């Protein structure tokens, strides 16, 4: 469950694959972000938290990174479909950053092997993220309502 807004609004949420297939190269890439990816829908909240913690640390591993030496007039462009931006504040001087985001394709991946995790019953003890997932799936009519 990818949540671009912290106030549990279904219109600001989306479900997308954790591993997406790049539409032009066909290569696979992890598509998780520590700021927006809330949980893995095929797992309960506890399992999801553990795996997401691992994956968000994995994508920041230095062996997968590119360091860029900024000079005056430098322009950097990257493809967010297969890369992530991570700032190290190890520079001096002023930088002016202008971000341009192009609306892209809907992330595609392989067909999921599991179905979304649904709490065992309406009155079951669940985490906030489990309830958030349940409400999202219910609003999109992706599950049968109790």
Regions found by a protein language model. Give the residues of each.
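Active-site environment of non-heme Fe oxygenases that use a 2-His-1-carboxylate facial triad
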Residues: 1-65, 75-77, 81-146
